[in-house]
Amino acid sequence: MSASLSRDSSSAPSLPNRRPSIVSSSSRPRQIIETARVGSLGTLDEAGNPFVSLVTVAALEPTRLILLLSGLAQHTKNLDRAPNCSLLLVEPGGEQGNPLAGARLTISGSAKRLARDGDEIARACFLAAHRSAAAYAEFEDFSFFQLDVDQIHLVAGFGRIETISASQLTSSND
């Protein structure tokens, strides 16, 4: 005897055509950007191959992030050659339990090295978030980089996915 798995569509609840925007219903992308202190930076190596490394990060604004990078690091050499990059940030605490159930976002943008004589605001922002970095921020081979956000791909949990532009992020009123 075989069981029938057909459903009566007349008894199924009706669903709205479109889920409300994650951005308009919460300030989650900005919260993640403002509270994340560590991220995975994706760059392209000399051969054009993807290269991912762990970096520390601080938000100057939701669309301008600051990184402190060593000139000895491969990701720094990659950014100097090709500034387009991505940065994965995970909502603090989201790495516990099932990390795929937590919120995270991938930032796409461009990173530029800041001049040492004009990086005071970036320096203050970064060192406020990473006090221990003061021990090496003055080393000659370290420089601050500003990552300018072009767009964000937000995964706010299972099935809650949205790609937003930098202008949408800054115009959100939540």
Predicted features, each with a name:
Residues P50, T76, G118, L154-A156:
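Intrinsically disordered, low-complexity acidic/polar segments
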Residues V52-T56, T106-S108, F144-Q146, I152:
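Conserved hydrophobic/aromatic beta-strand scaffold that supports enzyme active sites
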